[in-house]
Amino acid sequence: MSYIPYVVEQTSRGERTYDIYSRLLKDRIIFLGTEVNDVVANSIIAQLLFLESDDPEKDINFYINSPGGSVTAGMAIYDTMAYIKPEITTVCIGQAASMGAVLLAAGNHGKRYSLPNARILIHQPMGGFQGQASDIAIQAQEILRMKEALNEILASHTGKPLKQVQQDTDRDYFMSPLEAKEYGLIDHVILNREDLDSIEE
């Protein structure tokens, strides 16, 4: 089990202890720091919905350091990001790979950032199938459908032609932040908080 830091705040009623993620949530910050699976996705979705209900007009800041993971879980986060009213700022720290890259690109245009030493990876979904031949054929068809859906999402958010995205995701495609900016996955490479503040102003 991973260690979760706690922070203690002094209030008029005494001390109050938060786990670090709850404290960040108070400042409308969501942090994805693991692979994407159903449990993680449900937690992210709950936070997005809570922040919308708290203030539908105020931006949400979504920090991403993820190797990717489940496509269906990632799509659930992606659809929720599109569904809710607040605009979402995405920031890549470390890496945004596979579904992580899709979520990074899904931030509102003009509000997608990366720190300078991060890396971004796009590729096609992976599948390892077992079972009867007919079942494997069905699963393979579903992987192809998901692959096409992901390519269409990336094309939509980057402005790249679908055919180019299809070619680029056929194999692992690693990008530096500057390359990701040129590709259209992000809008800005930032060095520090001052860079972010100056862009937002």
From Swiss-Prot:
A GO MF term: ATP-dependent peptidase activity
Localization per Swiss-Prot or TrEMBL: Cytoplasm
Gene3D superfamilies to which the protein is assigned, alphabetical: 2-enoyl-CoA Hydratase, Chain A, domain 1
Keywords: Cytoplasm, Hydrolase, Protease, Serine protease
UniProt superkingdom: Bacteria
Family: Belongs to the peptidase S14 family.
PANTHER family: ATP-DEPENDENT CLP PROTEASE PROTEOLYTIC SUBUNIT
Designated name of the protein: ATP-dependent Clp protease proteolytic subunit
Protein's organism: Desulfatibacillum aliphaticivorans
